[in-house]
Amino acid sequence: MSVLKEYRTVSEVVGPLMIVDQVAGVHYNELVDITLHNGERRKGQVLEVQGDKAMVQLFEGSTGINLAKTKVRFTGHPLELAVSEDMVGRIFDGMGQPIDGGPELIPEKYLDIDGQAINPVARDYPDEFIQTGISAIDHLNTLVRGQKLPVFSGSGLPHNELAAQIARQATVLNSDDNFAVVFAAMGITFEEAEFFMNDLRETGAIDRSVLFINLANDPAIERIATPRIALTTAEYLAYEKGMHVLVIMTDMTNYCEALREVSAARREVPGRRGYPGYLYTNLSTLYERAGRLIGKKGSVTQIPILTMPEDDITHPIPDLTGYITEGQIILSQELYKNGFRPPINVLPSLSRLKDKGSGEGKTRQDHAATMNQLFAAYAQGKQAKELAVVLGESALSETDKLYVAFTNRFEEEYINQGFYTNRSIEESLDLGWELLSILPRTELKRIKDDMLDRYLPKADTTMTKVFVAND
């Protein structure tokens, strides 16, 4: 068996990859122990086996490896994570090793980080609401337990602050079930790592969170393993401990860049923009680990965050992510420049499962109707503002001016809630009604009369201010 053999037949090292000759009984994904000439120990994983040659990806980099004196031992099992319920409240590096100075964890079991394929027949349909405390998500792009809902950001936008806000505020309503957040940060700077750790500690959110941090100067191979380690932890807490787990993964662009780096080192034929041709398949092995299982109490919900290179939504990373996931939350450069936080652009954003997690018994009976009316009114108000820029304010009708007033207040009060305001779904719904009261009742055509009679406040026309863009 290969597990009993030690090889000194390293023939080549290229970037994060090492070639070992004259091997036997070695398997794909097998964990590798590497001992350098100075006694230093490193880990690797078998990427490919051809004949008697094995290609090994190195987790700690290839610096200092002496081809003739390096010893390689194949362990006979894949990379596994030691899991325990005591992981909640702890901080780990990208490979699952504690870095918070806490007590040593006693593992309850060891799990393969690649997980197990979920039989589609065993999946349960996501239909239960998760409250993030952010109106633009909870009310307009509802997040449902078991869903995968990515955030598409851009360079310089505050996606880290949004990720921390969701980690702090996310909760399950009307349930005594345990809720946990698994946070995986990939390729981030020391400053960003400090921000996440301090924010979760200072707000007390660390007590229900598991934090995995892969820094920008850590090896690319580790970056590829980090989200799998985080998802393995989430699956353990969800399906074996009955917890509802929200997994936040940032930044998936850094993950994909690591895939491209390893692919280039393997001299593979590149696909679109140099990314490997299997990028879609690889991303699906992460995103499809979200969900609920019939007969299991817990659930795994994902919010992957990615920065779109050059703000290009047709770039392979957001493009392929959109095919796999169930919607997207898009951050806007324009809203950010105008001082709105979080700068969520609600019109192109979408949660494909929002109808499944809203309504009476889940949120409130007026949820869907007000959501549709707010979308329609905001879109019409944006059109009126654009018309005023071209033709002037005098070209607007009185109704158009009311739509402009609605749009400005919608952005200033509804979207611009700040990163430290936690709104309940009832507060978001009530604020939506308050803003809709700016418009004439005859314009609220997407809401039934009985609902208007019950929820629509009386508009104070003397207080309505009309703002028209004069750019």
UniProtKB/Swiss-Prot annotation:
Entries under CDD domains matching the protein: ATP-synt_V_A-type_beta_C, ATP-synt_V_A-type_beta_N, V_A-ATPase_B
Pfam families on file: ATP-synt_ab, ATP-synt_ab_N, ATP-synt_VA_C
Domain of life: Bacteria
The keyword Ion transport belongs to this UniProt entry's keyword annotation: yes
Classification via InterPro entries: ATP-synt_VA_C, ATPase_a/bsu_AS, ATPase_F1/V1/A1_a/bsu_N, ATPase_F1/V1/A1_a/bsu_nucl-bd, P-loop_NTPase, V-ATPase_su_B/beta
Residue spans crossing the bilayer: none
Annotated keywords: ATP synthesis, Hydrogen ion transport, Ion transport, Transport
Gene3D superfamilies: 3.40.50.12240
Example GO molecular function: ATP binding
Keyword Cytoplasm attributed: no
Gene Ontology biological-process entries: proton motive force-driven plasma membrane ATP synthesis
NCBIfam families: PRK04196.1
Similarity annotation: Belongs to the ATPase alpha/beta chains family.
General function of this protein: Produces ATP from ADP in the presence of a proton gradient across the membrane. The V-type beta chain is a regulatory subunit.
Protein name per the record: V-type ATP synthase beta chain
Organism this protein belongs to: Streptococcus pyogenes serotype M1
Lineage: Bacteria, Bacillati, Bacillota, Bacilli, Lactobacillales
